[in-house]
Swiss-Prot record:
Pfam families: PRA-PH (PF01503). GO terms for biological process: L-histidine biosynthetic process. It comes from Brucella canis (strain ATCC 23365 / NCTC 10854 / RM-666). It catalyses: 1-(5-phospho-beta-D-ribosyl)-ATP + H2O = 1-(5-phospho-beta-D-ribosyl)-5'-AMP + diphosphate + H(+). Keywords: Amino-acid biosynthesis, ATP-binding, Cytoplasm, Histidine biosynthesis, Hydrolase, Nucleotide-binding. This is Phosphoribosyl-ATP pyrophosphatase. The gene is hisE. Transmembrane segments: none annotated. Pathway: Amino-acid biosynthesis; L-histidine biosynthesis; L-histidine from 5-phospho-alpha-D-ribose 1-diphosphate: step 2/9. GO terms for molecular function: ATP binding; phosphoribosyl-ATP diphosphatase activity. Belongs to the PRA-PH family. PANTHER family: HISTIDINE BIOSYNTHESIS BIFUNCTIONAL PROTEIN, HISTIDINE BIOSYNTHESIS BIFUNCTIONAL PROTEIN HISIE.
Length: 107
């Protein structure tokens, strides 16, 4: 099992985003801004879906890696930390979806 984590990815993206010598794809993507980074994220999401629908397991793995990378870039530009997302996931999974829905105000 891999020891690589999403926290590792977050750190690597942050490090590479600040490279100024023209060698970093991450830095060039960050320099193009959130619209371009979000576009790339969307493209990778679609490619992941296509691989999944096609039953292409290797494609799903490869495209998922691209998807997670581009998501980390979007988070970096937006100033969103992985920890923020994990806390939101924890909050959402603390109760079942039906219990959460029932707890919403009526009306």
């Amino acid at each position: 099992m891999s020891q690589f984590t999403l926290a590792d990815l977050e750190r690597i993206v942050a490090e590479r985003a600040s490279v100024t010598d023209g060698t970093s794809y991450t830095a060039s993507l960050v320099a193009k801004g959130q619209p371009k980074a979000a576009q790339k994220l969307g493209e990778e999401a679609v490619e992941t879906v296509i691989a999944a629908v096609s039953g292409d397991r290797a494609g799903v793995v490869s495209e998922s890696a691209d998807l997670l990378y581009h998501l980390a870039v979007v988070w970096n530009i937006a100033g969103v930390a992985l920890e923020d997302v994990l806390q939101e996931l924890q909050r959402r999974t603390a109760q079942t979806g039906l219990a959460e829905k029932a707890s919403r105000p009526k009306g």
